[in-house]
Amino acid sequence: MLYQAKALHGYKLNGRDGEIGKIKEFYFDDHYWTIRYLVADSGNWLTNRQVLISPHALGIVNKDAQNIAINLTKKQIEDSPPLNSEEPVSRQFEQDYYNYYMLPSYWDSPFMLGQYSSPSPSMSIRGKLPKSTFGPKTWDPHLRSTHAVSGYHIQVKDGDGGHVEDFMIDDETWIIRYLIINTKNWWEGKKVLVSPRWIKSVDWEESKVFVNLSREAIKQSPEYIEGSPLNREYEAALHQHYNFQGYWVNESPQNNSP
């Protein structure tokens, strides 16, 4: 199912021995446009540090109860590699994090999220893999915050196309399937969806996303009504409008992630 990122903010994260916090935002990698961490607001439990949860540990999203089951205990999270609340995520931290939970690293492993039908059982075991050779200040330049990228300007072939308002996330693979674009910058404020696959480039310093579409194509695009569920019929019409093949055509349930 596809969820708006902002709609998931505030969802409770229920660990094996109680609530560990609520979803605050998401970190995604800008190469595969896949969520790599949920950032949890742990309240007064773990202060002055970021609580990052890998999608490998996530169970089913319960929309009615607005919570997600986490295959972790509070003790595991408390003993995990710490990251200061003001500190950027470094590759050294990620290596330590993935070693601790004995997870295959997404940056150099053929085993990617989407190949597991349930949270990895290794999340319950502390890893004892070799220490990383990355330097302590090797920041990961490819991790982006959904909060920070919201508001980025969309540049189409013939001018301003609007701005990024939110993201549509697939809760089975945790891939960002669409960016929600608000066109009020230049048109009537209609909201449309744009797939990351249609993005030509991103200027992270200038906060601009360049898309190989025209204003007229966006005008004629099927409108996205905020809060309405997305079905395959709508997605098919959207892809047909832009003459693109649907992402689901070449994906299988056991191999649907980059």
How should these model regions be labeled?
Residues 1-258:
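Peripheral interaction segments used for macromolecular assembly
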